[in-house]
Amino acid sequence: MRFCLVFIRLAAFVILSGGATSTTTDNDDTRLLQTSNIETAAVANVLHVMQSSESSKRLLRLNDQADISGHDEERSSLIEKGWKKLRKLIKKVWKYVKKPFKKTAKIIKKPFKSRTKNIHIVYYKSRF
């Protein structure tokens, strides 16, 4: 139960603090993967936390190639898949959260502006 709450807060923190540059490492591959796109960095970090390192590496590679070779559509579909995974995980874990916490927690949606569309970030605000 406590692990679920910690994981939700970790995922929300990773999304919100994606920053301007993201660096992810993989145990199989020692190379560092970097990107300067904020929403791509956030989704890549969440995917990496969710043990989808292959999707994470592919997303970062596509982000680097998007401006040059026109992979923007494939990149946006990978970003959307990452958000869907995160939403499903939050819904799955949310039913195990204790009722007193549910009363103090608020689900807040804020638009996150990107080049093409708004991406809604869901994070949890509590009294802790």
Curated annotation (Swiss-Prot):
Q: Which segment of this protein is annotated as the motif RxLR-dEER? A: 58-75
Induction per the UniProt record? Expression is up-regulated during the early plant infection stages.
Keyword line:
Host cell membrane, Host membrane, Host nucleus, Membrane, Secreted, Signal, Virulence
Q: Where does this one sit in the cell? A: Secreted; Host cell membrane; Host nucleus
Kindly indicate where the leader peptide sits in this chain. Answer: 1-22
Give the UniProt entry's GO cellular component terms. Answer: extracellular region; host cell nucleus; host cell plasma membrane; membrane
Predominant cellular place of this UniProt entry's protein: secreted
- Member of which family? Belongs to the RxLR effector family.
What UniProt notes about the protein's domains is: The RxLR-dEER motif acts to carry the protein into the host cell cytoplasm through binding to cell surface phosphatidylinositol-3-phosphate.
What does the function comment of this entry state? Secreted effector that suppresses pattern-triggered immunity (PTI) in plant host.
Name assigned to this protein: Secreted RxLR effector protein RXLR-C09
- Source organism of the structure: Plasmopara halstedii
